Regions:
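Active-site- and interface-proximal helix/loop "cap" or "latch" segments in soluble metabolic
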Residues: 1-43
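An anion/pyrophosphate-binding glycine-rich loop and adjacent beta-alpha core
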Residues: 275, 279-397
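Helical element adjacent to the flavin cofactor pocket in flavoenzyme catalytic cores
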Residues: 181-239, 279, 283-285
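Beta1/beta-strand and adjacent pyrophosphate-binding region of the FAD-binding site
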Residues: 49-67, 83
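A glycine-rich dinucleotide-binding beta-alpha-beta segment and adjacent secondary-structure elements
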Residues: 212, 401-484
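Conserved N-terminal/central alpha/beta ligand/cofactor-binding core
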Residues: 90-203, 207-209, 321-329, 333, ...
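Glycine-rich loop(s) and the adjacent beta-strand/alpha-helix scaffold that form part
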Residues: 230-231, 236-302, 497-500
Length: 510
C-alpha cells in the first residue's frame, strides 16, 4: 500500500458529513489490526516518488470498496497479478459506512426463523418489481441466484461474521432475507477484505486517481492512466480493467444535473469520494451510461449531516414513523422512494422514528450503534424516555395524539392486523417503555444509473456491443436496480458482480 490515512485535509470537500466516514475508517482499521499513519504532504510526495511511472499487471481494479476488493481477490485467486487503485486516502467508500446487510434467498438463518418458502426467483421478482420493471432481468437473476454462494464465500473464505439469529426485512421485499454483519456496518466486511488482500499480497494504492482508460488500436481496454499528487502514472493491464468506483451521490452538481428534483433540501449519506468522475471516464472509452436520472434518497437520516441513522434500523423490527402531529402516515417497510416522498409531504418535511424495548431487544440497534446514540443525543435529535409523556415533551408532539397512536398500534399488534397500513412484518406492542425516538429526514443515497453491463459484468456500448477488456461492478453500473434499489441489494450486487468481473478479467489475461 502506497499510503492509507484518515487525514481529513486530504479529502477534497470534506465536511461534517464526512466525520462518520472517517470514524468508520478508523474503526475498520482497528478491527483489522491495522494502524493508519496520519498522512501529510511530505509522506504523500514520498509515496509518489517511490512508485514506478509505468507498471504492468494482468488486472487493474479501480475502486477499493466491496466490489473492487471482491474483484481483486477473486482475480488474484484465479492466478492474476492484480493491483487495486483507490483515489481516496483510505479504502472502503460507501461499502464501509453502509449498514452492509446482504439479501440472500435460502440463507442459513431463514430456517431458524421459520422462513422456508424463499427462493432466488422470488428475490429476483421483488427486485424487478421494486425497480418498477426497469431493471435488466438477466442481470437481476444472476445476482439473486449467485447470492448464496457469494455470502458463503464472505463467511467461509473472508471470515465475515454474520448474526446467526436475526435478519432484516427491508422495504419492497416479500420475505425477510437480509443477512446482518456483526456490528451492523460495513466495517466487518472491509476489515476482512483488507486483511485478505494483505494476505494475498495484492497492492492497494491509495491517493491514486484514475483519469483515463487506455485502449489499443483494436479498441480493447489495456490499462489506466492515473495521477497521485500531480504526478502521472500508467498501469498496463494484460487482461483488462475492472471499474468499481461507486456512484455519484456525493456530487450535488451531478445529482442535480440528472435529477433536478433532488435539490438543496437533500444532504447525502455517501462517502466523500462518491463523485462519479469515473462514469465519464467509462463513457469516453465507449461505454453507455443508462438510467442516470434514477437517484434514490434514504428516508431515515440525520437532519444535520445527512448521514444514515443506522440506530433507527429498529424500523425493520417494528419501530413506527410519526409526523409532527403524532400520526403514522405510511407503512414503515415501504420502498425507500415511497417513504422519502411521504416524509417530504409532512409538516416540516421530517418524521420521528419511535420504538420501545420490545422492539429494541430484537433489533439491538442502540447497543450496536452506541456511538451514534451518544452523538445524536448530544445533537438534540434523539432521546430515551421511560414514558410517552417524556417523548411528547421532547418531540413537541401532542401527548394525547401520541398516546392514542401508540395504543392503536399496540392493539393492532395484539390482533396481528395493521388495518391502517398493512405492515408486512407485523406491528409490535408498544404500550410499555423504555422508549427511544429520533428525528429523521431523507438524504441522497444511491444512484441507480451508470455503466451499461450484461450478466457477465462486461461493459457495453450504446449498440449493446461488449467493450473488450472492460468490466464494471457495483454502484458504478446502471442496469440492475431499475428506478429504485431495494434495501440490502447493494452488498449482494457488489459481491456477486465483483467476483464475476474479477474472474473474467483474470481469465482474459491468460
Amino acid at each position: 500500500m502506497a499510503l492509507s490515512s484518515t487525514d481529513v485535509d486530504l479529502v477534497s470537500g470534506a465536511t461534517f458529513s464526512a466525520k462518520g466516514f472517517i470514524d468508520a475508517v478508523n474503526d475498520a482499521a482497528k478491527k483489522a489490526g491495522v494502524t493508519l499513519a496520519k498522512a501529510d504532504k511530505k509522506a504523500l510526495k514520498k509515496a509518489a516518488r517511490e512508485l514506478p511511472k509505468t507498471s504492468n499487471y494482468d488486472v487493474v481494479v479501480i475502486g477499493a470498496g466491496g466490489a473492487g476488493f471482491s474483484a481483486a481477490i477473486t482475480a488474484r485467486n484465479a492466478g492474476a497479478n492484480v493491483v487495486l487503485l483507490e483515489k481516496m486516502p483510505a479504502v472502503g467508500g460507501n461499502s464501509l459506512i453502509s449498514g452492509a446487510e446482504m439479501n440472500v434467498a435460502k440463507n442459513w438463518v431463514q430456517p431458524k426463523l421459520g422462513i422456508n418458502d424463499d427462493s432466488p426467483e422470488l428475490h429476483a421478482q421483488d427486485t424487478f418489481k421494486g425497480g418498477d420493471g426497469k431493471g435488466d432481468m438477466k442481470v437481476i437473476n444472476v445476482m439473486t441466484h449467485e447470492a448464496l454462494d457469494a455470502a458463503k464465500w464472505c463467511r467461509d473464505y473472508l471470515g465475515v461474521r454474520f448474526e446467526d439469529d436475526n435478519l432484516f426485512f427491508f422495504g419492497g421485499h416479500s420475505r425477510k432475507r437480509a443477512l446482518i454483519p456483526v456490528g451492523h456496518t460495513g466495517t466487518e466486511f472491509i476489515a476482512k477484505f483488507q486483511a485478505k488482500a494483505d494476505e494475498l499480497g495484492i497492492p492497494v494504492i491509495t491517493n491514486m486517481k484514475a483519469e483515463e482508460l487506455i485502449k489499443n488500436k483494436d479498441g480493447r481496454v489495456v490499462g489506466v492512466k492515473a495521477t497521485m499528487d500531480g504526478s502521472e502514472y500508467t498501469f498496463n493491464a494484460k487482461g483488462g480493467v475492472v471499474l468499481a468506483t461507486g456512484g455519484f451521490g456525493a456530487n450535488p452538481e451531478m445529482v442535480k444535473k440528472y435529477n433536478p428534483k433532488i435539490d438543496e433540501r437533500f444532504k447525502t449519506t455517501d462517502a466523500p469520494g462518491t463523485t462519479g468522475e469515473a462514469l465519464y471516464m467509462a463513457e469516453r472509452a465507449g461505454a453507455q451510461l443508462v438510467n442516470m436520472g434514477y437517484i434514490q434518497t434514504y428516508p431515515i437520516c440525520d437532519p444535520i449531516s445527512g448521514a444514515i441513522e443506522l440506530i433507527a434500523d429498529a424500523r425493520f423490527d417494528g419501530a413506527i414513523m410519526l409526523n409532527q402531529e403524532g400520526k403514522r402516515f405510511v407503512e414503515e417497510l415501504q420502498r425507500r422512494d415511497v417513504l422519502s416522498e411521504a416524509i417530504l409531504n409532512q409538516t416540516g418535511q421530517y418524521c420521528w422514528v419511535l420504538w420501545n424495548d420490545n422492539i429494541g431487544k430484537i433489533s439491538n440497534t442502540v447497543k450496536a450503534h452506541a456511538n451514534e446514540y451518544e452523538a445524536f443525543t448530544k445533537q438534540g435529535i434523539m432521546t430515551t424516555c421511560d414514558d410517552l409523556k417524556c417523548i411528547a415533551d421532547f418531540t413537541k408532539i401532542p401527548f394525547d395524539q401520541l398516546r392514542k397512536t401508540v395504543k392503536r398500534v399496540s392493539d393492532m399488534a395484539g390482533k396481528g392486523n395493521d388495518k391502517d397500513f398493512n405492515h408486512r412484518s407485523g406491528l409490535v406492542d408498544m404500550q410499555q417503555g423504555k422508549y427511544y425516538v429520533i428525528k429523521a429526514v431523507p438524504s441522497t443515497h444511491h444512484t441507480m444509473g451508470g455503466v451499461r453491463i450484461n450478466e457477465k459484468a462486461e461493459a457495453l456500448t450504446a449498440e449493446g456491443k461488449v467493450i473488450p477488456g472492460l468490466w464494471a461492478a457495483g454502484e458504478v453500473t446502471g442496469v440492475t436496480h431499475g428506478t429504485n434499489r431495494l434495501g440490502g441489494n447493494a452488498y449482494t450486487d457488489i459481491i456477486v458482480f465483483g467476483r464475476i468481473a474479477g474472474e473474467a478479467a483474470a481469465k482474459a489475461a491468460k
